[in-house]
């Protein structure tokens, strides 16, 4: 079996701009993959055009070798755009191999370990009473882990107007999160995604405004470029961090794990769409 083509399909899922790829073979079996770098899908498409020439004629079963070829094929390897492109290819190749062998992908990775994977649901409502109402709806539907977003006063709109006000945000968000915990009790794990909008001081202030048992995880409170910043924040709060959505390589995780900074690596599906399965 040989790879004959790589096709790209930019699409929109809800408000997100996503990129789906299709790798075709000379035996009629094809694989689908996804790039996880939403809103930068055009940049990923540019990288995939480079990689397409390297893929044509390759054996799609040699997934690990292809990953290494793509990653090492140019002097300036790595980075979020290239990692997203490689991950889409990697996922599609596993799809091809699973179809050709007639097995699900997990059989290629050592077999099934469990019958289901725990997930969380995002409330998707503005911070306030609507957030609490949304949480009750999710609990009634059977969810036991929920995530919400932050209060975003004066958020930048589509016209580029407005300025995010962090101090107003942390105060209002913390107040309503404490109320949310009171409302749902211990029936659910609660997390919040701050989309790395805060400084260390702002994130510390936010955590200090929370009750001891309010949050089960705080996702991406600050930028990830310097582990030292997260290390400083780690000393200021007991709240577990969920980190890694911005990472573009497995090596970026190392200092966070070694220093005990993170207790939860970011969503597995997102990591696969950024790094691939072989990674």
Predicted feature descriptions by range:
Residues 1-14, 98-99, 103-116:
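N-terminal amphipathic alpha-helix/helix-capping segment at the start of soluble metabolic enzymes
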Residues 1-32, 36:
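Structured beta-strand/loop patches that form or line metal/cofactor-binding pockets in enzymes
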Residues 3, 28, 51, 89, ...:
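Conserved, mostly hydrophobic/aromatic
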Residues 21, 26-27, 32, 62, ...:
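Ligand-binding pocket scaffold of soluble enzyme catalytic domains
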Residues 26-101:
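Metal- or metallocofactor-binding catalytic centers and their adjacent structured scaffolds
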Residues 116-236:
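Metal-dependent enolase-superfamily TIM-barrel catalytic cores that perform enediolate-based chemistry
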Residues 200-207, 248-260:
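Catalytic cores of alpha/beta
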Residues 267-279:
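Single conserved hydrophobic/aromatic residue that forms the stacking wall/gate
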């Amino acid at each position: 079996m040989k790879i004959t083509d790589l096709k790209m399909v930019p699409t929109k899922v809800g408000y997100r701009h996503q990129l789906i790829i299709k790798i075709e073979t000379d035996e009629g079996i094809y694989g689908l993959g996804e790039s996880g770098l939403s809103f930068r899908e055009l940049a990923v498409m540019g990288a995939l055009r480079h990689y397409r020439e390297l893929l044509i004629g390759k054996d799609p079963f040699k997934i690990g070798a292809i990953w290494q070829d793509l990653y090492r094929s140019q002097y300036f390897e790595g980075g979020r755009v290239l990692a997203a492109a490689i991950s889409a290819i990697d996922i599609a190749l596993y799809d091809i191999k699973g179809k050709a062998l007639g097995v699900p992908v997990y059989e290629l990775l050592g077999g099934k370990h469990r019958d289901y994977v725990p997930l969380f649901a995002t409330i998707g409502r503005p911070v306030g009473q609507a957030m609490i109402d949304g949480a009750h709806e999710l609990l009634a539907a059977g969810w036991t882990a929920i995530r919400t977003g932050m209060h975003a006063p004066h958020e930048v709109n589509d016209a580029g107007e407005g300025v995010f006000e962090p101090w107003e945000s942390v105060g209002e968000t913390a107040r309503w999160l404490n109320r949310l915990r009171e409302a749902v009790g211990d029936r659910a794990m609660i997390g919040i995604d701050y989309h790395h909008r805060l400084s260390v001081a702002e994130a510390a202030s936010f955590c200090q405004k929370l009750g001891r048992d309010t949050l089960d995880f705080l996702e991406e409170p600050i930028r990830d470029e310097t582990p030292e910043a997260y290390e400083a924040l780690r000393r200021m709060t007991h709240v577990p961090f969920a980190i890694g959505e911005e990472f573009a390589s497995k090596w970026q995780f190392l200092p966070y794990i070694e220093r005990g900074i993170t207790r939860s690596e970011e969503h597995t599906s997102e990591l696969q769409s950024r790094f691939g399965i072989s990674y």
